[in-house]
């Protein structure tokens, strides 16, 4: 009996020690926030995403495993701006966990047509300057809920913010190669408003947001007319949706199909955009290449 008690005590102490030494755990709603948060957290915390690489995030359907994952977190980070329309109902099943919106302080652009007209465009991370606000909000959340690692988070956030700031000039130089008369970015989803605003591009798209009907005859006809009227040479699609509507527009308008852009999700680690910085670089390079520059 005495030996059994000693064993149980040792196991309990061991479990307590493991819990005491366990890293702070962050769960995010999608992979872009996961990568930004991991850069801020460094080795002081683990960061996991509910949605997997390549997943469609707007109308994601959470699973019981996702609830378990969120319940195991010390902190949950989500985008807000009506991106994750599933999140608030999902969060009702998660008890006593802090959830922080990482877009606080961003000036949102409005969706200008469709059922979501005048609602905020949620894809704010497509502006590097907005990414700095994401970094600051994530850092503040980590410092608040894991203060013992505050110095680590402060340093990592400053270092990562500097990397993001250094992206702007090369991205701007690449996009400046597109002639003024051709500076139209035509895509499937209207997810590039922030990128277009930052880098002086006009925007056209088949549907405003992925919750909409996608690739209806009316949408396709509207964009075909836009492309023809403005002599737009290239049309793009995005990685998390079908390319067929954009390809149809290209075929019927005489434009070129320029390939896949990345916005709503990172790729797997062995894919083309395993990080947020890769997402911006590859997307801009694909745009410029599509224009033949």
Swiss-Prot record:
Q: Which UniProt keywords apply?
A: Cell outer membrane, Membrane, Metal-binding, Periplasm, Signal, Transport, Virulence
Q: Which Pfam families match?
A: ZnuA
Any one of the GO BP annotations: metal ion transport
Q: Where in the cell is it found?
A: Cell outer membrane; Cell surface; Periplasm
The record's note on what follows loss of this gene reads: Mutant displays a reduced binding to laminin, vitronectin, and epithelial cells, and is more sensitive to killing by human serum compared with the wild type.
Asked whether the UniProt record includes Signal among its keywords, one would answer: yes
Q: Which GO terms describe its molecular function?
A: metal ion binding
Q: Where is this region: Interaction with host components?
A: 23-48
Please list which residues make up the signal peptide.
Answer: 1-22
Q: Which terms in the GO cellular component ontology are assigned? A: cell outer membrane; cell surface; periplasmic space
Assign the protein's first listed, main location to one coarse class. membrane
Tell me the residue numbers annotated for binding a divalent metal cation.
58, 123, 189, 264
Tell me the superkingdom of the source.
Answer: Bacteria
InterPro entries linked = AdhesinB, Bact_metal-bind_prot9, Lipoprotein_PsaA-like, ZnuA-like
Q: Which PANTHER family match?
A: HIGH-AFFINITY ZINC UPTAKE SYSTEM PROTEIN ZNUA-RELATED, METAL-BINDING PROTEIN HI_0362-RELATED
Biological function: Part of an ATP-binding cassette (ABC) transport system involved in metal import. Binds a metal with high affinity and specificity and delivers it to the membrane permease for translocation into the cytoplasm. Acts as an adhesin that promotes binding of H.influenzae to host laminin and vitronectin. In addition, interaction with serum vitronectin plays an important role in bacterial serum resistance.
Subunit record text: Interacts with host laminin and vitronectin. Can interact with both immobilized and soluble vitronectin.
Question: What family does this chain come from, according to its entry?
Answer: Belongs to the bacterial solute-binding protein 9 family.
Q: What is this protein called?
A: Putative metal ABC transporter substrate-binding protein Hpf
